[in-house]
UniProtKB/Swiss-Prot annotation:
Pfam families per UniProt: ECH_1 (PF00378)
Enzyme active site: 158 (proton donor/acceptor)
Induction record: By oleate.
Name used for this protein in its record: 3,2-trans-enoyl-CoA isomerase
Length: 280
């Protein structure tokens, strides 16, 4: 299968030895992602999966946010789609929401390489959900947090968070944060072993943070039999893979009802016009 892939102006990738490095590079827009950007992330994971020389997939970002989640422009674009293009609202949102979310979440769930996230700042929404699907997370400092503003946006859990958040943070903490739109702050992440290492670097120094993580990883893999790493990931993942696959299907089908009813669109419009407090 071809190892070539289309380009994306917001996301780059490169391969260095056993590392497949994905870089979010739209800091001026807080690395917000449109639907096609999330699909591109999934395509990159598939590309890394097919490369036999790759053992670790590293996701880095830039600026002060890892990713602020879905770009309002993408939501507006879907809202403005010609109604004649779709026979029903259900058909419209199956195309604009369900297919995309199932695809990118599945790409993260089934990824065979060790997934490493370099958390240079906050992550929001679906982007934060994908962070929670990573195997190892390093933080730039103690200012990082994850926020899942589903209740504030008229939505429900997505991106496997029905399973990943209780698994990694505990059931009651997950309820508290999701029900009341509270962030999973650094202390919560540390208490639950979610952050493997805090690099204690300034938030303005994302590029130096990314370079430092990569430098340490190069040292850590020296002398390892890397196929063993993939074998262990496969076994560890087998504990929860069925639950994640089920959650991915149930989440999008339940969420579809909310999109069809129109509440998320109304709330995104309010955010765009500043009528509702911004989720960031």
């Amino acid at each position: 299968m071809s190892q070539e892939i289309r380009q994306n102006e917001k996301i780059s990738y490169r391969i260095e030895g056993p590392f497949f490095i994905i870089h979010l590079m739209n800091p001026d827009n807080l690395n917000a992602l449109e639907g096609e950007d999330y699909i591109y992330l999934g395509e990159l994971l598939e590309l890394a999966d097919r490369n036999r020389d790759v053992y670790f997939t590293i996701i880095q970002s830039s600026g002060r946010f890892f990713s602020s989640g879905a770009d309002f422009k993408g939501i507006a674009k879907a809202q403005g789609d010609d109604t004649n293009k779709y026979p029903s609202e259900t058909s419209k949102w199956v195309s604009n929401f369900v297919a995309r979310n199932v695809y990118v979440t599945d790409a993260f769930i089934k990824h065979s390489k060790v997934l490493i996230c370099c958390l240079n700042g906050p992550a929001i929404g679906l982007s934060a959900a994908l962070v929670a699907l990573c195997d190892i997370v390093y933080s730039i400092n103690d200012k990082v947090y994850l926020l899942y503003p589903f209740a504030n946006l008229g939505l429900i859990t997505e991106g496997g968070t029905t399973v990943s958040l209780p698994l990694k943070f505990g059931t009651n903490t997950t309820y508290e944060c999701l029900m009341f739109n509270k962030p999973f702050k650094y202390d919560i992440m540390c208490e639950n072993g979610f952050i493997s290492k805090n690099f204690n670097m300034p938030s303005s120094n994302a590029e130096a943070f990314n370079a430092k993580v990569l430098e340490e990883l190069r040292e850590k893999v020296k002398g390892l039999y890397l196929p063993s790493c993939l074998g262990m990931k496969k076994l560890l993942k087998s504990n929860h893979i069925d639950a994640f696959n089920k959650a991915n299907s149930v989440e999008v089908n339940e969420s579809l009802k909310y999109w069809v009813d129109g509440e998320p669109l109304k709330r995104f419009r309010q955010l765009g016009s500043k009528q509702r407090k911004h989720r960031l």
